[in-house]
């Protein structure tokens, strides 16, 4: 059991105050503190103190004894800690993204390698051969977009902007997946006069439309006034997660985080195809080839947890990670898994022990539990979040 020393990513969209207000993390230079990373990602691994008292990378520690620390099954299947755990603090909208599935990631990665596209090139889509399933768990009210709305809903929302682009009128005549695909690509492809005219029609519709999703379009327009992604809340479900609610983000499904603080768990991948709300490169043909143009009703988007005593388990449809919450009390309970785990203190305080070793966690602090240290005993007040594998 080792307490983690974690790094903060200072992306421009991050909140300057959330990590300080929630977890007392200092921000003397008033930087945006977008993400706190917990894990062993090569870009920014957590660190731990070793037996000699030196501060070392968790990635290096795991590398030295994978089977013991990760567990036999995870070491064999993934060869590394297969997940990255984050606290994400969005003060402004992130780009609309789509993550390719595993098969397409393998093909795309090999193709771009063969073409000799450098890893850091703006037009590089595939940074690795992995998929990137994600779970987001709200710590504060959290605004997001996820998956296409039901087509009847899209039709009704597009009526006030029917004249903005011929592809909108075309979709309204026959609302089906193929025409939605054309509409999606056409809106992203808009340039110059065509784009200015479409956005002017959308903005004039805002004057007469109230409630959602128009309110979300207004919010986004404060940050991206000239981005064709402003049409996306008319096509995608706008989701407001209350604290304690969670949502899984499937491959090939457009989504965006807009505002709020959440825990996010993801597979170890950087494969992102952007689809708006970004100054970065958008590869429209590759994007459209990796999107499933199918509707997902908003009432099916939340992940329903399963309660087992003091544990809330959030079922995940992939093996890359599992996520659960533990309500703590003065009564000792055990936490066990066949894999490594990262425990994060969401609120209150936690005391963990294994044999003679004891560890205290305060809000915002986290610990790495090796597979061979399971089970650990825990008690306290408040809540722990646990990320691990069910292999």
UniProtKB/Swiss-Prot annotation:
Keywords attached to this entry: Acetylation, Cytoplasm, Isomerase, Metal-binding, Zinc
Gene Ontology biological-process entries: carbohydrate metabolic process; GDP-mannose biosynthetic process
Main localisation: cytoplasm
Cofactor list: Zn(2+)
Record's catalysed reaction(s): D-mannose 6-phosphate = D-fructose 6-phosphate
Sequence positions that bind Zn(2+): 97, 99, 134, 255
PROSITE patterns listed in its UniProt record: PMI_I_1, PMI_I_2
InterPro entries membership: Man6P_Isoase-1, Mannose-6-P_Isomerase, MPI_cupin_dom, Pmannose_isomerase-type1_CS, PMI_typeI_cat, PMI_typeI_hel, RmlC-like_jellyroll, RmlC_Cupin_sf
GO terms of molecular function: mannose-6-phosphate isomerase activity; zinc ion binding
Signal peptide stretch: none
Active site location: 274
EC number: 5.3.1.8
Record's subcellular location: Cytoplasm
Cofactor note: Binds 1 zinc ion per subunit.
Database matches in Pfam families: MPI_cupin_dom, PMI_typeI_cat, PMI_typeI_hel
One GO cellular component term noted in the UniProt record for this chain: cytosol
N6-acetyllysine modified-residue sites: 280
Function comment: Involved in the conversion of glucose to GDP-L-fucose, which can be converted to L-fucose, a capsular polysaccharide.
The family this protein is said to belong to: Belongs to the mannose-6-phosphate isomerase type 1 family.
The protein's name: Mannose-6-phosphate isomerase
Name of the gene encoding the protein in the UniProt record: manA
């Amino acid at each position: 059991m080792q307490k983690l020393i974690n790094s903060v990513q200072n992306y421009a969209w991050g909140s300057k105050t959330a990590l300080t207000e929630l977890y007392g993390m200092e921000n003397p230079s008033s930087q945006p503190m977008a993400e706190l990373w917990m894990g062993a990602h090569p870009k920014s691994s957590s660190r731990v103190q070793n037996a000699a008292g030196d501060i070392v990378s968790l990635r290096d520690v795991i590398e030295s004894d994978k089977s013991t620390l990760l567990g036999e099954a995870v070491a064999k299947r993934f060869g590394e800690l297969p997940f990255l755990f984050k606290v994400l603090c969005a003060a402004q909208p992130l780009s609309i993204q789509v993550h390719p599935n595993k098969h397409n990631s393998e093909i795309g990665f090999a193709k771009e390698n063969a073409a000799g596209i450098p890893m850091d090139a703006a037009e590089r889509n595939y940074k690795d051969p992995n998929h990137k399933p994600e779970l987001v768990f709200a710590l504060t009210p959290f605004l997001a977009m996820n998956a296409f709305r039901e087509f009847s809903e899209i039709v009704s929302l597009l009526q006030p902007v029917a004249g903005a682009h011929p592809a909108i009128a075309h979709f309204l005549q026959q609302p089906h997946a193929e025409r939605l695909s054309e509409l999606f690509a056409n809106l992203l492809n808009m340039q110059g006069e065509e784009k200015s005219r479409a956005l002017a029609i959308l903005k004039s519709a805002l004057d007469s439309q109230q409630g959602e999703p128009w309110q979300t379009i207004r919010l986004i327009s404060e940050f991206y006034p000239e981005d064709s992604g402003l049409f996306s809340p008319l096509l995608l479900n706008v989701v407001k997660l209350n604290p304690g609610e969670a949502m899984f983000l499937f491959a090939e499904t457009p989504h965006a985080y807009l505002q709020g603080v959440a825990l996010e768990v993801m597979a170890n991948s950087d494969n992102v195809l952007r689809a708006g709300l970004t100054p970065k490169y958008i590869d429209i043909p590759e994007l459209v080839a990796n999107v499933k143009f199918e509707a997902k009703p908003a009432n099916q988007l939340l992940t329903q947890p399963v309660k087992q005593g003091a544990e809330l388990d959030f079922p995940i449809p992939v093996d890359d990670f599992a996520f659960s919450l533990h309500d703590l009390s003065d009564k000792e309970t055990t936490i066990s898994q066949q894999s490594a785990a990262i425990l994060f203190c969401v609120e209150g305080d936690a005391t963990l022990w294994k044999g003679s070793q004891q560890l205290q966690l305060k809000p915002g602090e986290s610990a790495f539990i090796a597979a061979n240290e399971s089970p650990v005993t825990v008690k306290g007040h408040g809540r722990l979040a646990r990320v691990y594998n069910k292999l």
